Amino acid sequence: MSERRAKRPKISRGEDDFLPGNIIEIELHNFMTFNHLVCKPGSRLNLVIGPNGSGKSSLVCAIALCLGGEPQLLGRATSVGAYVKRGEDSGYVKISLRGNTREENLTIFRKIDTRNKSEWMFNGSTVSKKDIVEIIQKFNIQVNNLTQFLPQDRVCEFAKLTPVQLLEETEKAVGDPQLPVHHRALVEKSRDLKQLERAVAKNGETLNQLKALVDEQEKDVERVRQRELFLTKVDSMKKKLPWLKYDMKKAEYMDAKKRMKEAEKKLDEAAKNLNSMKEPIEKQKKEKAETDSKCKKVKNLMDANGRNRCHLLEKEDEADARVVATYKELEELKKQEEHRQERILKATEDLVAAERELQNLPVYERPVAKLEELSSQVTELHHSINGKKNQKEDNEKLLSQKRYTLRQCVDKLKDMENANNKLLKALANSGADRIFDAYQWVQQNRHEFKREVYGPVLVEVNVPNRENACFLEGHVSFYIWKSFITQDPEDRDLLVKNLKRFDVPVLNYVGNSGNQKAPFHISDQMRSLGIHARLDQIFDAPDAVKEVLNSQFGLEDSYIGSKITDQRAEEVYKLGIKDFWTPDNHYRWSSSRYGGHSSASVDSVYQSRLLLCGVDVGELEKLRSRKEELEDSILFMEETHKSLQTEQRRLEEEAAKLHKEREEIVNVSYLEKKKRRELESRYQQRKTKLESLEQEEDMDASVAKLIDQASRANADRYTYAINLKKLLVEAVAHKWSYAEKHMASIELERKIRESEINIKQYEKTAQQLSLAVEYCKKEVEGKQQRLATAKRDAESVATITPELKKEFMEMPTTVEELEAAIQDNLSQANSILFINENILQEYEHRQSQIYTISTKLETDKRDLSICMKEIDSLKEKWLPTLRQLVGQINETFSHNFQEMAVAGEVSLDERDTDFDQYGIHIKVKFRESGQLQVLSSHHQSGGERSVSTILYLVSLQDLTNCPFRVVDEINQGMDPINERKMFQQLVRAASQPNTPQCFLLTPKLLPELEYSEACSILNIMNGPYIAEPSKVWSLGDSWGSLNRRRTEASQCS
């Protein structure tokens, strides 16, 4: 078969057979299935083969992510963190691209971590993703183009591409880089063209309609303008009307101002007359004040004289009273002397009687011994009472402490019971919707059970070390946590009957006395591997609950290790431990029933969602026991307190009786002493009284003394009478003087009153004048304000200008005439009738619309012409080139398809100016009797679509402008014949001089295939025994180079 020529010139290959942009090395670390991988692909066709799951697609994902692709285009995980190898925090991908020369290598490095963060480097320097994208765009690398980069998970998407999408992808992948640019520009221009055509048609129609309406309205508009002329004249007259009213207000203001000045003049004359009448009155008031002052002085002398006279009269009355008292005292003295002798006789008799009574009173001896005995007994009782009080206080303090401790215990129990509610809520949130109802039913009906019933199991289990909770929860199935456990068959039947509606399991524990529990022992070897506990030892629960968990889930065979155990899992398995947990993973080994082969599984450890909500069951039981102990202790102490209180009350009553007896003895002693003291005091008082009566002075001396006192009092009375006479004469003189001056003052007051009456009449007249002035002022102010308002109103209507003043001169000069003229013009305007009041506005608005739309229409026509020229220009550049490109693809595709099937063709679907509808149709025929059908899932099988797809991609090989192409498992579903033909096509295409680098990933290859030097095979092997061989191949040597070395070695030997 003759070689077909290349369709267009390519960049020549270098001496190393690589093109610029080819991938020369791929390095992966902690990426998907690989710990570390270094791959050096060939320059042409690279067959990446390996079993399913070995990591072929990992290589595709690495190329896409390192060359700026997003996770979404791979059709797998949507975040870069998902591509980090499981169990690792970060990984990286490094790809080396061939530069423009053999020595120039471009290294792109991308580091990713589980937090979805990326770090980019180019040739060892940190850069941004934008810089990386710019670099790969220089080589036309498009990882988002399905014709260049077809991952396994997006193969089906390529077959689903519509003709329009297929054309877009083909333009990006092959041909002139300006093709997709011109296509997008044509699509945008065609949209603009359609919009402009619609706008021109719409505006032309609107313009014609508006012109027809304007022609109909012209006659009505002329009548409206005539009416507007009359109304304009009315408006001009209305402008003069407020100025005429302003002139009238101004004349009224000037008249009011004149009247105000006349009133002010009259007020000034009245004020002068009033001041001339006030001067004589002031002189009379001054003279009256001097007369009143003299009257006041005489009045003061009269008052002083009266006070002196009153003082003398008082003294005279006092002296008269002394005389009368002295005479009475003389008479009383005579009577007292007669009674004194009688009192002396009576006092002598009383003294003798008191002395006799005191001598006859017996002597009282106090019972001291009895009192001391009673005091001693009372003291002892008080000591006993104080002891009981101290005991009671100590008991009260201890009782208070116990009650406080009990309250704390009860509060803690409530908190822990609330924690049980949290556990029940966690179960409800996990799917056990009615677990609360089941729990409450069991609690309310516990009296009906024969033996203890436990449940839900989650409430009964306590994990002291919370770090172990995730292991136990991960090992035990969820259904067990919501289960109830009975220990009697009848209890089980009762629970099943009543809890069935709540959807909770019921398990019956019958005991397991026959089986002995395996002892827990950690050997030194296990401890060295990090094993430190067994799963059945990490939690506390009632025996029945624990036995059920052990029997159901084999907790005795599951161990707990550390991070060291993670690293030495294989050694742990060799000890016979087939199930163990580490902080991050759960390891399990199982043996095949047939061949006895062992297989291992590793699962991640997830955070506990149920057990970490729980409480310590042991602590809960301790708190309940402690609560009962405290309640018993408090009850005992309360009884003790009551007995101490009773004993104290008895001792206090006994002490009160003794105290009362002692008080009675003391009272008797006190009364006897008091009685003797009273008799002695009575005797002494009577003796003193007798001596006092005997020592009273003589009667004659007292009478002489009283007569002398009466004589002195009579002399004082005479002196007072003489002085009183002098004061009476002086008082008469003062009275006469006061009367004269007072009459003169009354006369002056009368004259002043008459003058003031006259002045008041003048003041009233002046006040009336003042009110008249104020009224005139207010009138002027009112006129002034109305004048200012009239001026503002007039100015708001129109400002006087020379032109307006000239118009005003032609109008009537009075308000009445002007108003009549306004009414005449309004009548004439109103006589012009028309149907549409807004006819003028509509006419002017339509004229404006006609102008706007005409301008817009001219602009749109001009833009339409320019747009059509631009489209024609772009179309001449784009369509011939595209037709030629599709023709070349069709030529290659038809030739390749004839070798594999019956017939196939690629055609361009042209849609005139609907450039967004242009597309590429792939039509194929696999049977001679059939017809060419468009490639789709309705007409072809999966294998036929795969053959068609790969042949289309091969047809693009020698037209492509990209450095490499990736196709993942495109031969899946092909029959052996088509697969062999397809492979030969790929090998032949790869042998072309300028064919781009190609990666073909497949899990299978047919035997006896023909290979060429342009074909490189990358065999991916993965598994537990690949570590040692990978070290041998770490240099990246190929099988061919190894064979050459062996041949050379054999020749040398």
Curated annotation (Swiss-Prot):
Transmembrane segments: none
Coiled-coil ranges from the UniProt annotation: 182-431, 617-798
Subcellular locations according to the entry: Nucleus; Chromosome
One Gene Ontology cellular component: chromosome
Tissues expressed in: Expressed in seedlings, rosette leaves and floral buds.
Keyword field: ATP-binding, Chromosome, Coiled coil, DNA damage, DNA recombination, DNA repair, Nucleotide-binding, Nucleus
Region listing for Flexible hinge, in residue ranges: 432-616
Keyword Nucleus among UniProt keywords: yes
UniProt domain comment: The flexible hinge domain, which separates the large intramolecular coiled coil regions, allows the heterotypic interaction with the corresponding domain of SMC6, forming a V-shaped heterodimer.
Family the entry assigns: Belongs to the SMC family. SMC5 subfamily.
Function: Core component of the SMC5-SMC6 complex that promotes sister chromatid alignment after DNA damage and facilitates double-stranded DNA breaks (DSBs) repair via homologous recombination between sister chromatids.
Name assigned to this protein: Structural maintenance of chromosomes protein 5
Organism whose genome encodes this protein: Arabidopsis thaliana (Mouse-ear cress)
Classification of source organism: Eukaryota, Viridiplantae, Streptophyta, Embryophyta, Tracheophyta
Gene that specifies this protein: SMC5
